[in-house]
Amino acid sequence: MRAGEVAALSLDDVHWRAGEITVRGKGSRCDRLPLPADVGEAICAYLHDRHPASTQERALFVRVKAPLVALTSCGVSSVVAAAARRAGLGTVGAHRLRHTAATQMLRAGASLPQIGQVLRHRYMSTTAIYAKTDREALREIARPWPGGRA
């Protein structure tokens, strides 16, 4: 998901019984996506332990300090960056997670249309930008040049 999509989530977007979440994306796009069990459990833990009960805010992710309002996309990016630093990953932005997910799916054998569907891209050309491969991966799948070394 994009940082802006995470920031826009409301409590009403989580459909617990159906195991789904409604995501409002770019271009007024609205999709109901599967909610993996581990993600649902993490959201439950967040709501129980961290979500301020004193707020009237319907946003799923709310600032923990006053004013108790919805996180912005910049706030989501800040949370991701702080978690990456704590994990020893250095500087990592929220959008980098989309690039990494696309690359990992590609390496696992997913097709560009499949990756585009997961990332919810309208155009394959957009997915191709995200699905970057490294030179080593290209060497492994490239056919040897005739007369060259294998």
Each model region followed by its residue ranges:
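Conserved tyrosine-mediated DNA breakage-rejoining catalytic core shared by Y-recombinases
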Residues: 1-42
